[in-house]
Amino acid sequence: MIKAICRMGNPILRKTAQPVTKDYLKTEDFSQLLVDLKDSMNHHGGIGIAAPQIGVSKQIAIIELMGFNRYGQEVNLPLTAFINPKIEYIDLTVQGFWEGCLSVPGLRGFVERAQKVKVTYWDLNGNEQSLEAEGFLATVLQHELDHLFGVLYVDRIKDLTLLSYQEEYNEFVIQKASLD
Ligand code: ZN
């Protein structure tokens, strides 16, 4: 079911979300949450979404990136749920992308993040998995996982002159790489 997106200013986006238990993964509530996340992500046009963004303060985020996306980056990550994720920074060299967020509609901001990360998480069955990622996918992972810890991309913009409305971004900003 498509849910309304919680926007910046809603306190749920500023809380650390609750870890879930393995028993929870067997519940109807969990299955429904996954459907709601996917429906809401697709409807609102995101490449990832975290549970707090649809009003559920649980440590669950989903990401789906296939082929060349509209940001000109080729990344392949089939629909994946990251449950109770932990992030490890493998290469602290930073890279910057213009980011956007369903919870901060109409804006774009240039954010520098670690170039390479390793995420350890539970899959849908509660089995531990890990994923190493670099480049654009590393940024997407950091953006989505930040949502589980009360952080928005705007918090990570170092130079606020690089925060722009979408229309002005389209008109004045040369860099094409950005994410929703
Ligand atoms: Zn976001």
Map each language-model feature to its residues.
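Positively charged
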Residues: 1-180
